[in-house]
Amino acid sequence: MAAKIRRDDEVIVLTGKDKGKRGKVKNVLSSGKIIVEGINLVKKHQKPVPALNQPGGIVEKEAAIQVSNVALFNTVTGKADRVGFRFEDGKKVRFFKSNSETIK
């Protein structure tokens, strides 16, 4: 099945501590989760690795978020939108359900 949310899409968070924030999808994981730029930041306690010359300390990084907790952001309407699929010229393309505009 084709993914409704893909890498480099702009999404908006629907639920959780980051509700309403927008960001760009950095990575889509096979477990039904995505990593979004600047969203769901967690602090990780990193051990130093002298062999790689990496210092230790507390590092802030993005954690994965469930795909069901985000929606694609429609720049035309300025709101979260649902995604559908259709065939155009023999190719399967994604489109916004609110205004039927093709995505990328």
Swiss-Prot record:
Native organism taxonomy: Bacteria, Pseudomonadati, Pseudomonadota, Gammaproteobacteria, Enterobacterales
Its job: One of two assembly initiator proteins, it binds directly to the 5'-end of the 23S rRNA, where it nucleates assembly of the 50S subunit.
Gene Ontology molecular function, alphabetical: rRNA binding; structural constituent of ribosome
Signal peptide start-end: none
Gene3D superfamilies for this protein: 2.30.30.30
SUPFAM superfamilies named among the record's database cross-references: Translation proteins SH3-like domain
Family per similarity comment: Belongs to the universal ribosomal protein uL24 family.
Disulfide bonds: none
GO biological process: translation
Cited NCBIfam families: rplX_bact
Keyword Ribonucleoprotein: yes
UniProt keyword DNA-binding present: no
Subunit structure: Part of the 50S ribosomal subunit.
HAMAP family the record matches: Ribosomal_uL24_B (MF_01326_B)
UniProt keyword annotations, A-Z: Ribonucleoprotein, Ribosomal protein, RNA-binding, rRNA-binding
GO CC terms in record: cytosol; ribonucleoprotein complex; ribosome
Protein source organism: Enterobacter sp. (strain 638)
Protein name: Large ribosomal subunit protein uL24
Pfam families per the UniProt record, alphabetical: KOW, ribosomal_L24
